[in-house]
Amino acid sequence: MMIRFYALRPFDEQAYCEPYSKQYGIDYAYTAEVPTPDNLELAKGCDAVSTNPCLIAPEYLEAWAAMGVKFLPCRSIGYDHIPQQKAKELGMRISHSWYPPAGVADYAIMLMLMCNRKVGQILRRADAQDYSLNGKMGRDITRMTVGVIGTGNIGRTVLRHLSGFGCKLLA
Protein backbone atom coordinates (compact mmCIF):
# COMPACT_ATOMS: atom_id res chain seq x y z
CA MET A 1 0.00 0.00 0.00
CA MET A 2 1.17 3.52 -0.81
CA ILE A 3 -0.09 6.51 1.17
CA ARG A 4 0.38 10.21 0.43
CA PHE A 5 0.38 12.53 3.44
CA TYR A 6 -0.64 16.13 2.88
CA ALA A 7 0.02 18.84 5.48
CA LEU A 8 2.27 16.50 7.45
CA ARG A 9 3.76 18.28 10.45
CA PRO A 10 7.50 17.61 10.67
CA PHE A 11 7.69 18.51 14.37
CA ASP A 12 5.43 15.70 15.58
CA GLU A 13 3.67 13.57 12.93
CA GLN A 14 6.63 12.78 10.70
CA ALA A 15 8.43 10.88 13.47
CA TYR A 16 5.73 8.17 13.33
CA CYS A 17 5.88 7.58 9.57
CA GLU A 18 9.12 5.62 9.28
CA PRO A 19 8.61 3.15 12.17
CA TYR A 20 5.00 2.42 11.21
CA SER A 21 5.94 2.18 7.54
CA LYS A 22 8.39 -0.59 8.38
CA GLN A 23 6.12 -2.28 10.93
CA TYR A 24 3.10 -2.47 8.62
CA GLY A 25 4.81 -2.60 5.22
CA ILE A 26 3.32 0.67 4.01
CA ASP A 27 5.16 2.94 1.60
CA TYR A 28 4.58 6.64 2.00
CA ALA A 29 5.38 10.06 0.61
CA TYR A 30 4.58 13.39 2.18
CA THR A 31 4.40 17.12 1.76
CA ALA A 32 3.92 19.91 4.30
CA GLU A 33 1.49 21.56 1.87
CA VAL A 34 -2.28 21.28 2.20
CA PRO A 35 -4.04 19.81 -0.84
CA THR A 36 -4.61 22.34 -3.62
CA PRO A 37 -5.53 21.94 -7.28
CA ASP A 38 -1.83 22.43 -8.06
CA ASN A 39 -0.55 19.51 -5.97
CA LEU A 40 -3.27 16.85 -6.28
CA GLU A 41 -1.04 14.97 -8.75
CA LEU A 42 1.28 14.11 -5.85
CA ALA A 43 -1.20 11.34 -5.00
CA LYS A 44 -0.72 9.58 -8.34
CA GLY A 45 0.00 5.90 -7.71
CA CYS A 46 -1.23 6.06 -4.11
CA ASP A 47 -3.90 3.87 -2.54
CA ALA A 48 -4.63 6.37 0.24
CA VAL A 49 -4.45 10.10 0.92
CA SER A 50 -4.12 11.27 4.51
CA THR A 51 -4.94 14.83 5.53
CA ASN A 52 -5.43 16.96 8.58
CA PRO A 53 -8.60 19.06 8.89
CA CYS A 54 -7.91 21.17 5.80
CA LEU A 55 -10.47 21.92 3.12
CA ILE A 56 -11.06 18.98 0.77
CA ALA A 57 -13.20 20.04 -2.18
CA PRO A 58 -15.34 17.49 -4.06
CA GLU A 59 -13.13 18.06 -7.12
CA TYR A 60 -10.12 16.85 -5.12
CA LEU A 61 -11.91 13.58 -4.40
CA GLU A 62 -12.79 13.17 -8.07
CA ALA A 63 -9.17 13.73 -9.09
CA TRP A 64 -7.84 11.33 -6.47
CA ALA A 65 -10.43 8.67 -7.33
CA ALA A 66 -9.38 8.91 -11.00
CA MET A 67 -5.80 8.23 -9.81
CA GLY A 68 -6.94 5.12 -7.92
CA VAL A 69 -7.11 6.49 -4.36
CA LYS A 70 -9.62 4.44 -2.35
CA PHE A 71 -8.97 5.37 1.28
CA LEU A 72 -8.93 8.71 3.13
CA PRO A 73 -7.50 8.36 6.65
CA CYS A 74 -7.80 11.71 8.46
CA ARG A 75 -5.34 12.80 11.09
CA SER A 76 -8.02 14.52 13.14
CA ILE A 77 -10.86 13.61 15.45
CA GLY A 78 -13.53 14.27 12.86
CA TYR A 79 -13.84 14.31 9.11
CA ASP A 80 -16.39 17.04 8.47
CA HIS A 81 -13.85 18.72 6.18
CA ILE A 82 -14.32 15.91 3.64
CA PRO A 83 -17.44 15.82 1.43
CA GLN A 84 -18.66 12.49 2.75
CA GLN A 85 -21.45 11.91 0.24
CA LYS A 86 -19.06 12.53 -2.65
CA ALA A 87 -16.53 10.11 -1.15
CA LYS A 88 -19.26 7.49 -0.81
CA GLU A 89 -20.36 8.00 -4.43
CA LEU A 90 -16.76 7.50 -5.54
CA GLY A 91 -16.33 4.36 -3.43
CA MET A 92 -13.77 5.99 -1.14
CA ARG A 93 -13.59 4.98 2.52
CA ILE A 94 -12.96 7.58 5.23
CA SER A 95 -11.49 6.97 8.67
CA HIS A 96 -10.31 9.24 11.45
CA SER A 97 -7.98 9.20 14.42
CA TRP A 98 -9.06 8.31 17.91
CA TYR A 99 -8.16 10.66 20.72
CA PRO A 100 -8.90 10.10 24.42
CA PRO A 101 -12.16 11.96 25.12
CA ALA A 102 -10.85 13.13 28.51
CA GLY A 103 -7.79 14.76 26.95
CA VAL A 104 -9.85 16.60 24.36
CA ALA A 105 -12.48 17.60 26.94
CA ASP A 106 -9.86 18.88 29.36
CA TYR A 107 -8.20 20.88 26.59
CA ALA A 108 -11.55 22.48 25.67
CA ILE A 109 -12.23 23.34 29.31
CA MET A 110 -8.73 24.77 29.69
CA LEU A 111 -9.38 27.09 26.73
CA MET A 112 -12.71 28.15 28.25
CA LEU A 113 -11.03 28.98 31.56
CA MET A 114 -8.23 30.84 29.80
CA CYS A 115 -10.78 32.97 27.94
CA ASN A 116 -12.77 33.65 31.10
CA ARG A 117 -9.62 34.72 32.94
CA LYS A 118 -8.22 36.73 29.99
CA VAL A 119 -4.98 34.74 30.05
CA GLY A 120 -3.97 35.81 26.54
CA GLN A 121 -4.20 39.48 27.47
CA ILE A 122 -2.38 38.89 30.75
CA LEU A 123 0.49 37.09 29.00
CA ARG A 124 0.82 39.73 26.28
CA ARG A 125 0.94 42.49 28.86
CA ALA A 126 3.42 40.56 31.01
CA ASP A 127 5.71 40.28 27.97
CA ALA A 128 5.68 44.09 27.90
CA GLN A 129 6.42 44.23 31.66
CA ASP A 130 2.89 45.57 32.29
CA TYR A 131 1.59 44.00 35.49
CA SER A 132 -1.23 46.46 36.09
CA LEU A 133 -4.64 45.05 36.97
CA ASN A 134 -6.68 47.34 34.72
CA GLY A 135 -8.86 45.27 32.36
CA LYS A 136 -7.73 41.92 33.72
CA MET A 137 -10.84 41.10 35.73
CA GLY A 138 -11.98 37.66 34.65
CA ARG A 139 -15.35 35.94 34.87
CA ASP A 140 -16.26 33.21 37.33
CA ILE A 141 -17.37 30.04 35.53
CA THR A 142 -19.47 28.97 38.53
CA ARG A 143 -21.87 31.83 37.74
CA MET A 144 -22.13 31.01 34.07
CA THR A 145 -24.37 28.88 31.90
CA VAL A 146 -22.30 26.68 29.60
CA GLY A 147 -23.81 25.06 26.53
CA VAL A 148 -22.28 22.05 24.81
CA ILE A 149 -23.30 21.42 21.21
CA GLY A 150 -22.81 17.78 20.34
CA THR A 151 -22.96 15.22 23.11
CA GLY A 152 -21.01 12.33 21.68
CA ASN A 153 -18.12 10.86 23.67
CA ILE A 154 -16.22 14.12 23.88
CA GLY A 155 -19.25 16.34 24.52
CA ARG A 156 -20.47 14.07 27.32
CA THR A 157 -17.00 14.09 28.85
CA VAL A 158 -16.90 17.91 28.71
CA LEU A 159 -20.25 18.01 30.52
CA ARG A 160 -19.10 15.52 33.15
CA HIS A 161 -15.88 17.44 33.79
CA LEU A 162 -17.66 20.81 33.87
CA SER A 163 -20.16 19.51 36.42
CA GLY A 164 -17.48 19.90 39.10
CA PHE A 165 -17.26 23.64 38.45
CA GLY A 166 -20.83 24.29 39.60
CA CYS A 167 -21.94 26.09 36.45
CA LYS A 168 -25.35 25.58 34.84
CA LEU A 169 -25.02 23.14 31.94
CA LEU A 170 -27.04 22.98 28.72
CA ALA A 171 -26.74 20.15 26.22
Predicted regions and their residues:
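Phosphate/diphosphate ligand-binding glycine-rich loop within oxidoreductases
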Residues: 46-123, 135
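A short, aliphatic-rich alpha-helical micro-motif
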Residues: 42-44, 66, 141
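Short, well-ordered beta-strand segments
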Residues: 2-6, 50, 70, 147
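N-terminal glycine-/charge-rich "phosphate-binding" loop or analogous flexible N-terminal tail
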Residues: 1-46
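Short gly/ser/thr-rich secondary-structure transition/capping motifs
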Residues: 27-34, 52-54, 125-134
